[in-house]
Swiss-Prot record:
Bromo domain location: 6-116, 139-249
Subunit-structure text: Component of the RSC complex composed of at least arp9, arp42, rsc1, rsc4, rsc7, rsc9, rsc58, sfh1, snf21, ssr1, ssr2, ssr3 and ssr4. The complex interacts with histone and histone variant components of centromeric chromatin.
Keywords, sorted A to Z: Bromodomain, Chromatin regulator, Nucleus, Phosphoprotein, Repeat, Transcription, Transcription regulation
Regions of compositional bias (Acidic residues) in chain numbering: 119-128
UniProt xrefs under PANTHER family: PROTEIN POLYBROMO-1 (PTHR16062:SF19), SWI/SNF-RELATED (PTHR16062)
Residue ranges with Low complexity bias: 268-280
Gene that this polypeptide is encoded by: rsc4
Pfam families: Bromodomain, RSC4_Ig_like
Record organism: Schizosaccharomyces pombe (strain 972 / ATCC 24843) (Fission yeast)
Keyword hit for Transcription: yes
Keyword Repeat: yes
Region (Disordered): 114-139, 246-327
Name this polypeptide is given: Chromatin structure-remodeling complex subunit rsc4
Length: 542
């Protein structure tokens, strides 16, 4: 049953009370943030906002609509609140101040609108009502297990134009460590894996019970992800496909095999027929990389796949990177274990070669050394020594340059994947955050050792490596190193689309000379060996 407050006639007094409650909200530090949503962003400073956001809305516009009588029901007002939240989460990166404040607004508005905080129950009811009408006792009886199996097989085989399986995003739940807010927003998590487990246990005795869980999975995806995002669109397409298949199967008598007929859902041009064997579907689903990958999940490395067509040419399986890798350094792109909220919607998995061939891509990204005042970040972890099991590259700070007049500058802390140099960090950036200061924090124990840091952007080395000055080594000889991390600062201008930043730390090892030649420096009898590589994939939204 839909909450009556949504369809209730518009009440100006109730409107004022709800808006006052939303305006009075404060962030985690106790600071009000109503000014962020009071008016629309400046067209002068944020022209791209009005290219990305098609229906801008703010508190001021809501007051004007209430004053001029444009709200016919309280539901119209709450719909504008949800639109404002969706706009904020579409334009701003997850983890930013605006994004986090929008989540708080959404939760508060939902609880005010309905006592039990139910969201989007209309979609469940529409699906269930259509099923109840089409599957009443005495009408066309169907083989429920066979229909469910065909629906699952069809969902597993649905692809987009680039050949990407849409169901991959819905196989597993997000990591609680990487996405803690997911479980605060989504109260009834559901995945394809959970559906299949219940199906195998025989818990779905009716088609209605299966469709209810299936529809819950799509509602969760459309609640947590903003409209227009990859996940939201995939959920919409799969929801249309499942609805079409259910309608088609319900029209067939039990003795008729649904696997022999073709079903072409509307508005899904590349949809497969449901005549897919269960064994074929299960074999494919076990080989794909799940959209949320944690350190305890193994995924077969695949080619790099991105949402943008201009990157597609670099993700062919036939491409082989010839960059040599020392035997003691694993390939840096074997697995994807760290990801930002939106990253899984843009990138599926990474190749096993160390660096994709981005050199032929016509990008305008630049990078160089930079000096600036360090923001107040939390101190990174450090180590007293550097055994083989500890990291030398500790973490990275990413922030907007202080000279840019941004109302919501970016500030991000990225811990390096612990004890595993094969993991990759992935972030999604809003267009206004394409100018960055990147701070690499090194283990302070390196102050007593000879090391080299090399930076690469899209596979191309940028400038000379930053090495430890010999004078520093002599001055610190025999002195215990400080606990302050060694920081190297870079300034980067990233282009729209996918950017690959790599920070390679090498150490110098002595090499026995073939013969003693007077006059040669000691460096002539040494070599640089790659020890660690921190890889950051940054996707700048268009």
């Amino acid at each position: 049953m839909v909450d009556d407050s949504h369809n209730a006639p518009f009440d100006k007094t109730k409107f004022d009370e709800v808006l006052e409650a939303l305006v009075g909200l404060k962030d985690n530090e106790g600071n009000p943030f109503d000014d962020i949503f009071e008016e629309l962003p400046s067209k002068r400073y944020f022209p791209d906002y009005y290219q990305i956001i098609q229906k801008p809305i703010c508190y001021k516009m809501m007051r004007n609509k209430a004053k001029t009588g444009k709200y016919l029901s309280m539901g119209d007002f709450y719909d504008d609140i949800r639109l404002m939240v969706s706009n904020a989460q579409t334009y701003n990166m997850p983890g930013s101040l605006v994004y986090e404040c929008s989540v708080l607004i959404a939760n508060t508005a939902n609880s005010l609108e309905s006592k039990d905080g139910t969201l989007n129950e209309e979609e469940n009811e529409e699906m269930e009502s259509s099923i109840n009408e089409e599957h009443k006792p005495g009408t066309n009886e169907i083989d429920v297990p066979k229909v469910i199996q065909n629906i699952l097989d069809a969902l597993h085989e649905e692809k987009d134009e680039q050949g990407r399986f849409l169901i991959d995003i819905f196989i597993d739940l997000p990591s609680k460590r990487l996405y803690p807010d997911y479980y605060e927003i989504i109260k009834s998590p559901m995945t394809i894996k959970m559906l299949e487990k219940r199906f195998k246990k025989g818990e779905y005795t009716t088609l209605e019970s299966f469709v209810k869980d299936l529809n819950q999975m799509f509602i969760n995806a459309k609640t947590y992800n903003a409209p227009g995002s990859f996940v939201y669109e995939d959920a919409e397409k799969l929801s249309q496909l499942s609805s079409s298949l259910i309608s088609s199967f319900s029209e067939q008598p039990k003795e008729h095999s649904p696997a022999t007929s073709k079903h072409e859902p509307e508005e899904t041009p590349a949809s497969p027929t449901p005549s897919v064997s269960a064994s074929t579907s299960r074999e494919r689903s076990t080989s794909v990389a799940p959209s949320f990958i944690t350190s305890d999940q193994a995924a077969t490395p695949d080619v790099l796949k991105s949402e943008e067509a201009h990157v597609e040419s670099f993700s062919k399986e036939s491409e082989k990177d010839q960059t040599p890798i020392p035997e003691d350094v694993p390939s840096p792109m074997d697995t994807l274990s760290q990801a930002n909220y939106g990253a899984f919607a843009l990138i599926k998995s990474f190749p096993s070669t160390p660096v994709p061939d981005f050199l032929n891509f016509s990008h305008k990204s630049v990078m160089g050394r930079s000096t600036f005042n360090m923001p107040n970040f939390p101190e990174p972890k450090f180590f007293e020594d550097i055994p083989n099991t500890e990291r030398c590259i500790l973490s990275a700070f990413i922030c907007s340059p202080p000279q840019l007049p941004l109302p919501n500058p970016l500030r991000m802390y990225l811990p390096c994947p612990s004890l595993n140099s094969t993991e990759v960090s992935v972030i999604t950036l809003a267009p206004q955050h394409s100018f960055l200061n990147i701070v690499i924090n090194l283990n302070p124990a390196l102050a007593l050792k000879s090391y080299t840091i090399i930076t690469l952007l899209n596979g191309k080395r940028l400038g000379a490596g930053v090495s430890t000055p010999p004078s520093t080594l002599y001055a610190l000889e025999g002195i215990k190193h400080t606990e302050e991390p060694i920081r190297t600062v870079y300034e980067a201008k990233l282009s729209v689309g996918l950017n690959c930043l790599e920070f390679v730390l090498g150490s110098t090892e002595p090499v026995e000379p073939p013969s003693i030649e007077p006059g040669l420096p000691a460096s002539a009898y040494s070599r640089t060996v790659e020890r660690e590589r921190f890889v950051l994939m940054a996707y700048v939204q268009p």
